[in-house]
Amino acid sequence: MKVLVLGAGVAGVSSVWYLAEAGHEVTVIDRTEGVAMETSFANAGQLSYGYTTPWAAPGIPTKALKRLFKSHPPLLFRPDGGLYQIEWLWRMLQNCTATRYQINKERMVRISEYSREMFRRFEAQTDMNFEGRKKGTLQIFRQTEEVEAAKQDIAVLERYGVPYRRLKPEECAEFEPALARVTAKIVGGLHLPADATGDCRLFTENLYKLCQEKGVRFYFNQTISRIDHNGLRIKAVETETGRFETDAVVCALGCFSRTVLAQLDLNLPIYPVKGYSLTLPVTNSDGAPVSTVLDESYKVAITRFDNRIRVGGMAELSGYETKLPEKRRETLALVVNDLFPEGGDLSQALSWSGLRPMTPDSTPLIGRTRFENLFLNTGHGTLGWTMSPGSAKLTADIVSGKDTEIRSDDLSLSRYQKL
C-alpha cells in the first residue's frame, strides 16, 4: 500500500520506519529542508518514562498562577490574540480533576512503557548511535516545599510500579558527582534509574538514513496547499511543487497538524507550547552531568551527551512565534552555571526554541479519523522523544489493519467527542 507521511520529525520518521518494516511503499513530505528541523531539533534529550505525567492535574491551576510571578518563571502566558488559546486552556482546566488525571496518566504511561520496549527492540535490531545513556533521571529540589509536593508524585510512581529512590542532598552526588560542589544549594533529590537520555535529532537523522536504505522517498521544502478528498477518503496531498497520490496518509506534523487538517473540518485540540534550550561544549568532564538532572525550581533539565551539555525546558503559551527571549536564555544559563559551573563553556552555547504540540489531556492523538485512510500520530507535547517509537509502532499497526500490541482505541481523536 502507498502511504504518505506528513512530517519528518521524530514522530514522522519513526512512523516511516515501522511502515516500511511492514512492507508499505512510503513517501514523506516536510516543509523544511531536512529531518528533525523543528520540534525534534534541540529538545532536552530526556527519555522520561518514569516522569510521564499529564500537565493537567489537581492543583495545577493554582501552582501555575504562583509560578507566573517568579523572577525566573518556568511558565509564561502571553495572549496570542485568538479565541482558540482560551478554548484550549479551558479544555485543559477540565482535565485538572482527579478522575481525568488518572485516566490520562494511565494512557500516557501505557504509551511510554510500550515505547521503552520498542527502543529496546530497536537497539537490538540496529547499531545506531544517538549518544544515548541509560543512567536515569535525577530530580533535585532546592526548597523543602518542593520535597513535600513531590510526595504526590512519588505516590503515583508507586502506584504504577516505577522504580525510584529518595535522596538526601549529599546522596545526589552518588549519581551526579559534580553536584558534590553545590550540595548546599540542594535540600533533596529523587532518582529514577529506569529513565534514559539521547539526542533526538541525531536519532532522527540516523533513522532517516536507515529508512532511505529501505527505499523510502523523502521530499523536503514541500508546503501543503490542498488535500484532495471525496468526503470519505484522501485521494492526494498537493504542495506548491507537486501532487502526491496515496492510499493512506499519516499526519505527524506536530503543532501544524491542526492548521493543515483544518481544511478537512477536523478540529485537532493541539496548541503550540514553546520550549527553549542551550547546547554548550563540555570543557571539563568531571564538572559536567553524567546523565540528566531536572531542576524542580526552574523546570529546567540539564542533559549530558557525549561532548555536549543540553540545557532545556520551561514553557510559554504565546502562539506560533519561536523567538527565544533573552530573559529565558538567562534562566537557562543561570541554572547550568549554578549547578555545573565548571562543566561547559556558555560563551559557545547555541540557542534554540521550538514548539511542542500539546493536547489538553497531555495524551497524543494516535489512530483513525473520520476519513477512512487518514491517520494521526501527533500531539505528544513534551514527550514526543520519549513516546516516539511506541506511538509510531501503534500507528503503523493501525494503518496496516493489524491488532496493536497494547490498547489503542482510546488514543484517537474521537475521545474528544466523548468529553
From Swiss-Prot:
The set of disulfide-linked cysteines is none
Provide the reaction this enzyme catalyses.
a D-alpha-amino acid + A + H2O = a 2-oxocarboxylate + AH2 + NH4(+)
State its cofactor. FAD
The record's keywords, sorted A to Z, are:
FAD, Flavoprotein, Oxidoreductase
Give the highest taxon in the source lineage: Bacteria
Question: One GO BP annotation here?
Answer: D-alanine catabolic process
Q: Which residues bind FAD?
A: 3-17
Q: Which GO terms describe its cellular component?
A: cytoplasm; plasma membrane
Instruction: Give the InterPro entries listed for this entry.
Output: DadA (IPR023080), FAD-dep_OxRdtase (IPR006076), FAD/NAD-bd_sf (IPR036188)
- Uppermost EC category: oxidoreductase
UniProt EC number? 1.4.99.-
Q: Which GO terms describe its molecular function?
A: D-amino-acid dehydrogenase activity
Pathway where this protein functions: Amino-acid degradation; D-alanine degradation; NH(3) and pyruvate from D-alanine: step 1/1
Task: Summarize the protein's role.
Answer: Oxidative deamination of D-amino acids.
UniProt family annotation: Belongs to the DadA oxidoreductase family.
**Which NCBIfam families does its entry note?**
PRK00711.1
Q: What is this protein called?
A: D-amino acid dehydrogenase
Q: Which organism does this record belong to?
A: Neisseria gonorrhoeae (strain ATCC 700825 / FA 1090)
Q: Top-down, what is the taxonomic lineage of the species of origin?
A: Bacteria, Pseudomonadati, Pseudomonadota, Betaproteobacteria, Neisseriales
